[in-house]
C-alpha cells in the first residue's frame, strides 16, 4: 500500500492499494487482471450460495409437502434482514455458519449414501433437519455477502445482484429435475464448494474493492472499522472535529430523507402477495398468469429494468421520487385489476415490486457516501430481501391447494 501526499487523492498514479491474498496484484486503478479474476470467482461463489439457499427452501417444501413451512422460512429471511449486526460479529457468525452448512451437508449426504440401511422415516427426519440447518446458515451467509458487495464499487454491487438471481434460477431448477443420484451429487458438491471459502472477504481483498472503498470513505481501514471526520459547531459556536464511525450511523435518518424510495417497494412487497392470493381465490389453478415460470420471469425483468433505469434516476433531479410514485401507482392499478379478476395483474405487480426494490437499493447505496454508506447498504439489503420474499410468497400461493 502506497500513498503519495504531494498528489491529489483519487488520481490514478497516486494511490496503490494492493491485495494481501491475490498474487501478482498490481493495485492500480488502471486495471488488475489477477484481482478481476479473483472478484469473478467471488461472484460465482456468491451465486452458488444463493443457489444453495434457494435449493434448501425448495427441498424443505418437497420433503414436508406443507406450504406453511415454506412461508415460515421465507418470513424468517425477512426478519433476519431487519437485524443489524456489526461487521466484526457478522464475520464470526459467517465463519461458524459456513462450518454448519458444510457439516449439515455432509451428514445429509452420509444418510443418503446409507440408503436402505436407514429407515425411510428416520432418513426423512434427518435429511429435513440437515437441510433446515443449511437454510439457517445459508441465510446468514447470503446476507453478509450482500453487505460486502454493496460496500464496494457500483460494478461489484450490480455483479453480485446478477450472481444472486442467477444462483436463484439455478436453485429453482431442483423443481424441474427428478431427484436421482447425479442431481443430488451435484447439489452436495455445490453446497460444499460454497462452504469452503468466505467469498465476501475474498471480494473485499481485491485492489478494485479497496480503491473503491477509499474513494467513498477516504480511509484505508476495512469494512466496518472506518471513521470519517467532520467540522461541527457546539452551542458556543466553537468549531470542533467530530468522529463519525460507520457502524454508528443511524438507519432512521434515511427513512426521513428518502421515504418514497424506501417505502414504495416495501408496500409492494406486502401488496403483491395479496394480489396473487385474491386472483388465486378467483381463478384457482386455472390462472395461466400464476406459474413458477412467471415468477422467475418477473424477477429477471425487474432486475434488468432497474439496472437500466439506475443512471437516469441517479443523474436527473426528482426522478427517484417520480419513479417511486409510478411504482406505487402501478401497485394501486394492479390491486384494482385484481379486484375485477384480471389475471395479468399478478405478474405486473410482481415485476413492479422487483423493479422498485432493486432500483431503490441501487439508488440508496449510491446516494450515501462516506461513513453513511454502510448504514445505507443495510437498508438496501432489506429491500433486496423484500423482493425475494415477495417472489417466494407468490410462489407459495401457487403451490397451495
From Swiss-Prot:
Q: How does it sit in the membrane?
A: Multi-pass membrane protein
Report the superkingdom from the record.
Answer: Viruses
The region annotated as signal peptide is none
User: Major place of localization?
Assistant: membrane
Q: Which UniProt keywords apply?
A: Membrane, Transmembrane, Transmembrane helix
Where in or outside the cell? Membrane
Its transmembrane ranges are 43-63, 67-87, 93-113, 124-144, 159-179, 182-202, 259-279, 294-314, 332-352, 379-399
Note the Pfam families from the entry. Answer: Herpes_UL43
Give the GO cellular component terms, alphabetically: membrane; viral tegument
What family is reported?
Belongs to the alphaherpesvirinae HHV-1 UL43 family.
Q: Any idea what this protein is called?
A: Membrane protein UL43 homolog
Amino acid at each position: 500500500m502506497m500513498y503519495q501526499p504531494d498528489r491529489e487523492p483519487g488520481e490514478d498514479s497516486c494511490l496503490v492499494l494492493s491485495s494481501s491474498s491475490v498474487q501478482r496484484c498490481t493495485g492500480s486503478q488502471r486495471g488488475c487482471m489477477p484481482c478481476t479474476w479473483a472478484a469473478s470467482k467471488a461472484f460465482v461463489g456468491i451465486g452458488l450460495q444463493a443457489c444453495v439457499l434457494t435449493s434448501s427452501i425448495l427441498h424443505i417444501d418437497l420433503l414436508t409437502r406443507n406450504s406453511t413451512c415454506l412461508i415460515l422460512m421465507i418470513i424468517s429471511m425477512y426478519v433476519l434482514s431487519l437485524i443489524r449486526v456489526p461487521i466484526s460479529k457478522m464475520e464470526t457468525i459467517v465463519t461458524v455458519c459456513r462450518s454448519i452448512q458444510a457439516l449439515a451437508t455432509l451428514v445429509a449426504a452420509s444418510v443418503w449414501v446409507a440408503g436402505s440401511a436407514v429407515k425411510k422415516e428416520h432418513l426423512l427426519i434427518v435429511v429435513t433437519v440437515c437441510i433446515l440447518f443449511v437454510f439457517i446458515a445459508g441465510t446468514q451467509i447470503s446476507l453478509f455477502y450482500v453487505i460486502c458487495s454493496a460496500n464496494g464499487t457500483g460494478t461489484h454491487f450490480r455483479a453480485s445482484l446478477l450472481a444472486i438471481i442467477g444462483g436463484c434460477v439455478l436453485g429453482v431448477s431442483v423443481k424441474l429435475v427428478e431427484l436421482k443420484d447425479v442431481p443430488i451429487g451435484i447439489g452436495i458438491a455445490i453446497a460444499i464448494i460454497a462452504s469452503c471459502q468466505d467469498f465476501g472477504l475474498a471480494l473485499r481483498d481485491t485492489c478494485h474493492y479497496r480503491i473503491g472503498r477509499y474513494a467513498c470513505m477516504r480511509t484505508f481501514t476495512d469494512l466496518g472499522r472506518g471513521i470519517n471526520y467532520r467540522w461541527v459547531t457546539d452551542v458556543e459556536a466553537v468549531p470542533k472535529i467530530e468522529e463519525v464511525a460507520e457502524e454508528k450511523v443511524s438507519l432512521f435518518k434515511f427513512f426521513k430523507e428518502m421515504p418514497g424510495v424506501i417505502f414504495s417497494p416495501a408496500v409492494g412487497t406486502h401488496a403483491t402477495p395479496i394480489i396473487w392470493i385474491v386472483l388465486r381465490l378467483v381463478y384457482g389453478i386455472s390462472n395461466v398468469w400464476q406459474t413458477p415460470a412467471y415468477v422467475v420471469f418477473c424477477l429477471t425483468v425487474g432486475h434488468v429494468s432497474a439496472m437500466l433505469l439506475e443512471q437516469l434516476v441517479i443523474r436527473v433531479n426528482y426522478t427517484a421520487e417520480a419513479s417511486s410514485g409510478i411504482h406505487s401507482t402501478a401497485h394501486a392499478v394492479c390491486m384494482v385489476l385484481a379486484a375485477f379478476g384480471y389475471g395479468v395483474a399478478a405478474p405486473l405487480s410482481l415485476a413492479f415490486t422487483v423493479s422498485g426494490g432493486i432500483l431503490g437499493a441501487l439508488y440508496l447505496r449510491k446516494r450515501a457516501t462516506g461513513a453513511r454508506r454502510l448504514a445505507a447498504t443495510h437498508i438496501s439489503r432489506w429491500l433486496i430481501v423484500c423482493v425475494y420474499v415477495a417472489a417466494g410468497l407468490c410462489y407459495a400461493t401457487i403451490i397451495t391447494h
